[in-house]
UniProtKB/Swiss-Prot annotation:
It comes from Prochlorococcus marinus (strain MIT 9515). Keywords: DNA-directed RNA polymerase, Nucleotidyltransferase, Transcription, Transferase. This is DNA-directed RNA polymerase subunit beta. Gene3D superfamilies: 2.40.50.100, 2.40.50.150, 3.90.1100.10, DNA-directed RNA polymerase, beta subunit, external 1 domain, DNA-directed RNA polymerase, subunit 2, domain 6, RNA polymerase alpha subunit dimerisation domain, RNA polymerase Rpb2, domain 2. InterPro entries: DNA-dir_RNA_pol_bsu_ext_1_sf, DNA-dir_RNA_pol_bsu_external_1, DNA-dir_RNA_pol_su2, DNA-dir_RNAP_su2_dom, DNA-dir_RNAP_su2_hyb_sf, RNA_pol_bsu_bac, RNA_pol_bsu_CS, RNA_pol_bsu_protrusion. GO terms for cellular component: DNA-directed RNA polymerase complex. GO terms for molecular function: DNA binding; DNA-directed RNA polymerase activity; ribonucleoside binding. Belongs to the RNA polymerase beta chain family. Its EC number is 2.7.7.6. One of its GO terms (biological process) is DNA-templated transcription. NCBIfam families: PRK00405.1, rpoB. HAMAP family: RNApol_bact_RpoB.
Length: 1097
């Protein structure tokens, strides 16, 4: 293929930096967030008020990290920097001031790619979307079908305040869902007189009933109101006026306990049209009165008052890394404050220094807990560059302070009109998290308040103004404008052509003339997320399939020789660049040196810039990270140019799969139900071969009987098996290993008790044996094989941090090449996925008129019912492009260039391809897009013409090698005594109720009995059966399954007298075989078979 790519449809868009969300947020934390927190805790005074400790937040500094990123990964360390802050201790009595720089903890730093390295693993902090603080007005139906209204004031942290009305038109208030209190009681407790309240309201007559109700209860002074408030909020405690005052103040007016946050203050001011200054973050009397006023206007149905939609993106905000980390730092500082106060009280006031007071542990623990075990700190998905990029742009509604899967209803998960251009309507997981985990749209950004904004071009008198920068609008602002979609047709100077334009206005669609349009979307792609925007002809796919297509691109395994798509969307290079997988030069200059490990660029001033390349590193998902240079020595490069390809990249563009020749036709039933028939060429030419790197680890521990030893001298092992081990007993790099081979030899000291009787006898006869050790080596697991890539040895002497009790840790990395095989999962970009059912020799595959055999045969029945016709467009466009020897970029949503544009373009390209020399067979106008294929086995043509073309097909990470599994004898569950489940536990196959029904229906009684007893949890039966098989005797009758006994015991423990009886009414003792069996192991071994119980009579 030539590297020229034709851009069909010009997009006037360049994408923003796609990882900006993460980077900007962390930068804000370092510059502002951390200082804000340190300042808010300063000063800390002791209980007597003698000592004051000030944190001087602006003067905090970070030390250089101890390890750089690569070193941290290799040593399993955290890439972090030490934080120091200047503290000032003031003794009020003597006036003495001590100033000192104090260590307050380690802060993990973000790498350039927007990730964190915690204990050697790359992690991502996912953005969280939560309800914005502010005031919300809702309506509810009471049980008589009458509408009541309520208002909630939700702070960033602190108590919720909820105002509600009842059927008698009385106003009530609840604090944090406690019992309701007459609203006027709260007003009086806050020190407001009746007139203060009445003057502020536009319709005081509604409120007067609440005043009367308060008077009727005998609460007519501030003191009585405070007592009443205290009774309601703290029932059971003796009320007092001072207690009431303190309670009210701490609940709503103390900045440490109640904080609306910058956003909350902004939202309240905006909703209630107030002018309270930005830095007042607690409730004011004005807030409460305006809320009551607004609520009364709602009740009386007076214009200007509107209800809030809590799913509107104007009422939900994004908390990114910076803010989540700031909240965590606050938790740590809260604990620290308590410790400091205690130490101030206990210590000698004169000799105290700031360093003695400040203990870094609570802050370190809080930060560590956040990065290590928070729901939002996730192990990065590194399957391919797209997976990595999408993970950083993910927005989750779960996590601390968010929703839970079980509680989230349908409304929260649903697509909302305000998502347009902000959250992708397509990319979300299938299953219980659907709609709770979203992806940021391509052009969206998060503003300073945490609301998502999206860009537009302004329209003046029907002309789109594309000069200068686009205007970013948040969901609130956009609601008030008439916004046209990005694919409206315009002339050269930007005048809108149509007479009526469909626009969105206040979450509805209407048609207006061009001069009424306020804004036009930047690009048709801005509605969808990055992964979705890589699907060509997306507009022809059903949404459910586009969702699968988006999600499956993230699961594509990087191939040995990746190939970028013939039909792309034009965003491929940006995705590769922003994922951080490809090295980019930051200067203009000349490439002065290139080899496999580094690229050196000399800039204009003669300075050398070295770029080290990643070679065969293991990713989090065991795929292979490797970079290959694409520049040559002496090449001119400009700033921002890609120097090398990463995994799943080619020519600086993302390349997740291969372009293969596909035919849509049934073939001997091998592609029934989404199965895929592939040609042997895929295996022999390594089209879908990928490299996987497994990590195996063993530690030599200190045991009670002495240390374990890593050695070559392993008992009862032939010299042949030790061929590839070095003198230490560790495998040499480059060795090929099969399953069961020793990677690291290790022996463990063995105690007296570990010896079987025959060995004791031998030792008694022949005296002391040389050493008493047991083989405990690290071996290659079943079903695995490969080549040793790297061996790393960690010891305390080298200064490595080891787990407690370990003397040495050895890690072996084994690489395997996995060719495609039957059982692997493959997929296209349109949600068309399937499993390989057969690999045919290429001579048997159907072939084209020029003799080319096809690579893949798919079932045409997979298209109509699933409505993902985009795959057919891609197929034919790819066919034309391959014959024209070019690559094509098609932007989704192309109707702005005319109706049925996709169709016309593909037809035009096919016609163009057939005009080439000797290629007239490529396009048949009678049957466009179809060719008459011949059967490779007989050479006869098939009955019907078949759709053939090139499509981009991916191999997904669900490989059969990782799933195939068999068990003979293995571990059992302790309680039920049934075999465990799953490959990792060496488990058995589950026989569920449906399988039992099938065997019952078939009448296979003995097979069924065997499956439910001796092959599962009849303990005595399975031991006897094994014994019988070993000795060649008939298998005895099965006994009672253990799980049945457990059920009986459980029912008996409820006090039910339940037993099993024979026909004659004689009770069967289920527990008769329990006692003798206690001595034998639960897992039959050949040693236990030799014991006297099972001896022949």
């Amino acid at each position: 293929m030539s590297s020229s790519a034709l851009q069909i449809a010009k997009t006037a868009t360049y994408l923003p930096d796609l990882v900006e969300v993460q980077r900007a947020s962390f930068k804000w934390f370092l510059e502002k967030g951390l200082i804000e927190e340190l300042k808010s805790f300063s000063p800390i005074t002791d209980y007597t008020g003698k000592l004051e400790l000030h944190f001087i937040g602006e003067e905090y500094r970070l030390k250089r990290p101890r390890h750089d990123v690569e070193e941290a990964k290799r040593r399993d360390a955290t890439f972090a920097s030490q934080m120091y802050v200047t503290c000032r201790l003031i003794n009020k009595e003597t006036g003495e001031i001590k100033e000192q720089e104090v260590f307050i903890g380690e802060l993990p730093l973000m790498t350039e790619r927007g990730t964190f390295i915690i204990n050697g693993a790359e992690r991502v902090i996912v953005n969280q979307i939560v309800r914005s603080p502010g005031v919300y007005f809702k309506d509810e139906m009471d049980k008589n079908g009458r509408r009541t209204y309520n208002a909630s004031v939700i702070p960033n942290r602190g108590a919720w305040l909820k105002f509600e009305t009842d059927k008698n038109n009385l106003l009530y208030v609840r604090v944090d869902k406690t019992r309701k209190i007459n609203a006027h009681v709260l007003m009086r407790a806050m020190g407001l007189s009746d007139n203060d309240v009445v003057d502020k309201l536009r319709h005081p007559e509604f409120y007067k009933q609440s005043i009367d109700a308060a008077n009727d209860e005998g609460i007519n002074s501030e003191d009585q109101a405070l007592l009443e408030l205290y009774k309601k909020l703290r029932p059971g405690e003796p009320p007092s006026v001072s207690g009431g005052q303190q309670l009210l103040h701490s609940r709503f007016f103390d900045p440490k306990r109640y904080d609306l946050g910058r956003v909350g203050r902004y939202k309240i001011n905006k909703k209630l049209r107030l002018t309270v200054p930005d830095n007042v973050r607690t409730l004011t009397h004005e807030d409460v009165l305006s809320t009551i006023d607004y609520l009364i206007n709602l009740e009386l149905d007076i214009g200007g008052a509107s209800l809030d939609d809590i799913d509107h993106l104007g009422n939900r905000r994004v908390r990114s890394v910076g803010e989540l980390l700031q909240n965590q730092v606050r938790v740590g500082l809260n604990r620290l404050e308590r410790i400091i106060k205690e130490r101030m009280t206990v210590g000698e006031t004169d000799s105290l220094t700031p360093a003695q007071l400040v203990n870094p542990k609570p802050l370190v623990a809080a930060i560590k807990e956040f990065f290590g075990s928070s729901q939002l700190s996730q192990f990065m998905d590194q399957t391919n560059p797209l997976a990595e990029l999408t993970h950083k742009r993910r927005i989750s509604a779960l996590g601390p302070g968010g929703l839970t899967r079980e509680r989230a209803g349908f409304a929260v998960r649903d697509i909302h009109p305000s998502h347009y251009g902000r959250l992708c309507p397509i990319e979300t997981p299938e299953g219980p998290n659907a709609g709770l985990i979203n992806s940021l749209a391509t052009h969206a950004r998060v503003n300073e308040y945490g609301f998502i904004e999206t860009p537009f071009w302004e329209v003046e008198k029907g002309r789109v103004i594309k000069e200068g920068k686009p205007v970013y609008l948040s969901a609130d602002l956009e609601d008030e404008c008439r916004v046209a979609p990005g694919d409206v047709a315009t002339d050269k100077s930007g005048n809108i052509l149509a007479n009526l334009i469909p626009v969105r206005y206040r979450q509805d669609f209407e048609k207006v003339p061009p001069h009424q349009v306020d804004y036009v979307q930047l690009s048709p792609v801005q509605v969808i997320s990055v992964a979705t925007s890589l699907i060509p002809f997306l507009e022809h796919d059903d949404a459910n399939r586009a969702l699968m297509g988006s999600n499956m691109q993230r699961q594509a395994v990087p191939l040995l020789r990746p190939e970028r798509p013939l039909v792309g969307t034009g965003l491929e290079s940006q995705v590769a660049r922003d994922s951080g997988m490809v090295p980019i030069t930051k200067v203009n200059g000349i490439v002065s040196y290139v080899d496999a490990n580094e690229i050196v660029v000399k800039d204009v001033d003669g300075n050398e810039h070295v770029h080290y390349l990643q070679k065969y590193q293991r990713s989090n998902q065991d795929t292979c990270l490797n970079q290959r240079p694409i520049v040559k020595n002496g090449d001119q490069v400009i700033s921002g140019q890609v120097l090398a390809d990463g995994s799943a990249c080619e020519g600086g563009e993302i390349a997740l799969g291969q372009n293969v020749l596909i035919a849509y036709m049934p073939w001997e039933g091998y592609n029934y139900e989404d199965a895929i028939l592939v040609s042997e060429r895929m295996v022999t030419d390594d089209l879908y071969t990928s490299v996987h790197i497994e990590k195996y680890e063993i530690e030599a521990r200190q045991t009670k009987l002495g240390p374990e030893e890593i050695t070559r001298e392993i008992p009862n092992i032939s010299e042949e098996s030790l061929n590839n081990l070095d003198e230490m007993g560790i495998i040499r790099t480059g060795a090929f290993v099969e399953s069961g081979d020793i990677l690291v030899g290790k022996v463990t000291p063995k105690g007296e008790s570990d010896q079987p009787p025959e060995e004791k006898l031998l030792r008694a006869i022949f005296g002391e044996k040389a050493r008493d050790v047991r083989d405990n080596s690290l071996r290659v697991p079943k079903t695995e094989k490969g080549r040793v890539l790297d061996v790393r040895i960690y010891t305390r002497e080298q200064g490595d941090e080891l787990p407690p009790g370990a003397n040495m840790v050895v890690r072996v990395y084994v690489a395997q090449r996995r060719k495609i095989q039957v059982g692997d999962k493959m997929a296209g970009r349109h949600g068309n996925k399937g499993i390989i059912s057969r690999i045919l020799p290429r001579e048997d595959m159907p072939y084209l008129p020029d003799g080319t055999p096809v690579d893949i045969v798919l079932n045409p029945l997979g298209v109509p019912s699933r409505m993902n016709v985009g795959q057919v467009f891609e197929l034919l466009m790819g066919w034309a492009a391959s014959n024209l020897n070019c690559r094509v970029k098609v932007v989704p949503f192309d109707e702005m260039y005319g109706a049925e544009k996709s169709h016309q373009t593909v037809q035009a390209f096919l016609k163009e391809a057939s005009k080439q020399n000797g290629k007239d067979w490529v396009y048949n106008p009678e049957d466009p897009g179809k060719l008459l294929l011949k059967d490779g086995r007989t050479g006869e043509p098939f009955d019907q013409p078949v759709a053939v073309g090139y499509s981009h097909f991916l191999k997904l990470v669900h490989l059969v090698d990782d799933k195939i599994h068999a068990r003979s004898t293995g571990p059992y569950s302790l309680v039920t005594q049934q075999p465990l489940g799953g490959k990792a536990q060496q488990g058995g196959q589950r026989l569920g109720e449906m399988e039992v029904w099938a065997l019952e229906a078939y009448g296979a009684a003995y097979t069924l009995q065997e499956l439910l007893t001796v092959k599962s949890d009849d303990m005595q039966g399975r031991n006897e059966a094994l014994n019988a098989i070993v000795k060649g005797k008939p298998i005895p009758r099965p006994g009672t399954p253990e799980s049945f006994k457990v059920l009986m015991r459980e029912l008996q423990s409820l006090g039910l007298d339940i037993g099993v009886y024979t026909d004659e009414g004689k009770e069967v003792d289920l527990m008769q075989d329990v006692n003798p069996r206690r001595n034998t192991p639960s897992r039959p071994t050949y040693e236990s078979l030799g014991t006297s119980e099972y001896e022949e009579d």
